[in-house]
Amino acid sequence: MEQWESRGHLLTEQINPNSLNLDQLNPLELVDLFNREDAQTLKAIAMARQELALGISLTSQALAKGGRLFYIGAGTSGRLGVLDAAECPPTFCTPPELVQGIIAGGAAALVRSSEDLEDKAEDGAAIIAQREIHELDVVVGITAGGTTPYVHGALQAAKQRGATTIAISCVPAEQVEIAVDVDIRLLTGPELLAGSTRLKAGTVTKMALNILSTGTMVMLGKVYGNQMVDVAVTNHKLHDRALRIICHLTDVSREEAAILLEKSGRRVKLALLMQKTGLSAAAGQELLQKHRGQLRAALQAYNQID
């Protein structure tokens, strides 16, 4: 991609005038400078609020129809996608295939830098074919500088297969055009350490992924109030959290919550429905399935019948 050989014009590659004396600062001055610059991330998210909201809407609609969400990137961008995807099963009890993170170079690139692999657009296209991306899926390409061939190859291939495509980058559209359904631009300006996009660009990207995945799960009914009622109860900490969620939302004792949790097969959402309706685990599960796992909708339907 010869048009991208010179990258000095990109916002993420430019020199930050606020950090020209970076190597002369003492530790406290360094911390204060980073703190001031990181404030740009909040502004960038605010400026991209419409695109982020559209991304949530399209992604939740696709997943509700049986689609999957894929993050794809290289280097820091790829690692952030893998991280966000990995957090979905324990937080929302989703199957691991529902939200997947793909990084150029595979698992080895998570712990060892493999920057050269990002230059192969054909590899990005190949991974889309390998994962059998289809029209119900959503593919989020993450590239801070907007030019990563691996990501562009993946997005183009995904689009050809009819998938919904979303791009997350930290450069303005006039610098790099990305042909996608939702174009999220997170403009945090030049990095304190010139070109080191693991800094502000990485931070704001993680913020955007937090919003996109959590917002999608909220729309899918994985949350009740502000509680993670689909939490996977897989260790002592999460068992304690599950009990506290049940206690908070029902006012039962911790001992009663523990009994409910076991009767529900350690499914918090089902335990809540059982307590609030008096239904058996089987009947409660049937009602939840009828309402696509939406606890609030299931409760409203039960109360109308009752």
Curated annotation (Swiss-Prot):
SIS domain sequence ranges: 59-222
UniProt cross-references to Gene3D superfamilies, sorted A to Z: 1.10.8.1080, Glucose-6-phosphate isomerase like protein, domain 1 (3.40.50.10490)
CDD domains, alphabetized: SIS_Etherase
GO molecular function, one term: carbohydrate derivative binding
Active site: 87, 118
Pfam families: GKRP-like_C, GKRP_SIS_N
Keywords: Carbohydrate metabolism, Lyase
Keyword 4Fe-4S in record: no
Catalysis performed (reactions): N-acetyl-D-muramate 6-phosphate + H2O = N-acetyl-D-glucosamine 6-phosphate + (R)-lactate
GO biological process terms, semicolon-separated: amino sugar catabolic process; N-acetylmuramic acid catabolic process; peptidoglycan turnover
UniProt entry tagged with the keyword Cell membrane: no
InterPro entries referenced in this protein's UniProt entry, alphabetically: Etherase_MurQ, Glucokinase_regulatory_CS, MURQ/GCKR, SIS_dom, SIS_dom_sf
Enzyme Commission designation: 4.2.1.126
Pathway: Amino-sugar metabolism; N-acetylmuramate degradation
Subunit and partners: Homodimer.
Record PANTHER family: GLUCOKINASE REGULATORY PROTEIN
Role: Specifically catalyzes the cleavage of the D-lactyl ether substituent of MurNAc 6-phosphate, producing GlcNAc 6-phosphate and D-lactate.
Miscellaneous comment in the UniProt entry for this protein: A lyase-type mechanism (elimination/hydration) is suggested for the cleavage of the lactyl ether bond of MurNAc 6-phosphate, with the formation of an alpha,beta-unsaturated aldehyde intermediate with (E)-stereochemistry, followed by the syn addition of water to give product.
Membership in a protein family: Belongs to the GCKR-like family. MurNAc-6-P etherase subfamily.
Official protein name in the record: N-acetylmuramic acid 6-phosphate etherase
Organism placement in taxonomy: Bacteria, Bacillati, Cyanobacteriota, Cyanophyceae, Oscillatoriophycideae
Gene name in the database record: murQ
